[in-house]
């Protein structure tokens, strides 16, 4: 029997090269083993479970400015597991300890990430926040967060795309210093080199400058490092803040 229907109306036929049976006996896509294998093969291009279209921007209440003139502004961060923004409770604890020393201070945020800590410092009255971050993508998030708070990047906010060590060495040569330095590197990073440079007087105010290090709670830092003296250690869950003061 000859099928006289137009080609586009005929049933789709899946045929092995050595199969000479009429198409009525070969079976359709559902019972054809070759069509089944074809559906199970990895497909090219975008996959159904791909995260390509998943938004990489994270905006939650945890990323909210907690106090000051920009209180309540939602900050942006990335969904990447490699980035660990400073939690809201840690920021609240940090500025509770610093208290009035933030006002009119020059604040340096090393390994700034999305810039939440530096933005919070400006909100609480800091004269200047300098954000040091090696990732161009995260520097863009910092700029967006400054724009959200209507902070001019050439005024109260300064963004530097650079690694921490080269930045500190460069600023040491220029004899530039800050009143408060906040250092929050990835937890698997080497803290020693950066702290050692700062302890020799690099980037920190000679009389009364403060260095705050965020680190895992099980990590311990000595009482004295160079010109730095440990004043306080505050633990919040599995995270701790160590406060050093510089007397040069």
Regions found by a protein language model. Give the residues of each.
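Class I S-adenosyl-L-methionine-dependent methyltransferase catalytic core
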Residues: 2-248
């Amino acid at each position: 029997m000859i099928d006289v229907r137009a080609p586009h109306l005929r049933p789709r036929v899946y045929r092995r090269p050595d199969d000479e049976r009429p198409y009525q006996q070969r079976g359709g896509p559902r019972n054809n083993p070759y069509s089944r294998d074809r559906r199970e093969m990895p497909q090219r291009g975008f996959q159904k479970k791909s995260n390509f279209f998943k938004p990489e921007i994270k905006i939650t209440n945890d990323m909210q400015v907690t106090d000051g003139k920009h209180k309540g502004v939602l900050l942006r961060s990335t969904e990447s597991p490699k980035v660990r923004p400073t939690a809201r409770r840690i920021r609240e604890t940090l500025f509770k300890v610093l208290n009035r020393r933030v006002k009119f201070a020059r604040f340096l945020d090393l390994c700034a990430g999305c810039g939440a800590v530096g933005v919070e410092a400006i909100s609480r009255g800091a004269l200047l926040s300098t954000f040091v971050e090696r990732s161009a993508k995260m520097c863009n998030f910092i700029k967006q967060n400054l724009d959200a708070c209507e902070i001019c990047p050439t005024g109260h906010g300064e963004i530097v795309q650079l690694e921490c060590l080269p930045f500190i060495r460069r600023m040491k040569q220029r004899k530039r210093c800050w009143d408060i330095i906040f250092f929050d590197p990835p937890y698997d990073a080497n803290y020693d080199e950066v702290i050692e440079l700062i302890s020799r007087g690099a980037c920190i105010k000679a009389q009364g400058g403060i260095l705050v290090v965020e680190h895992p709670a099980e990590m311990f830092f000595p009482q004295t490092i160079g010109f730095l003296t440990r004043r306080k250690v505050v633990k919040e869950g599995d995270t701790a803040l160590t406060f050093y003061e510089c007397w040069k």
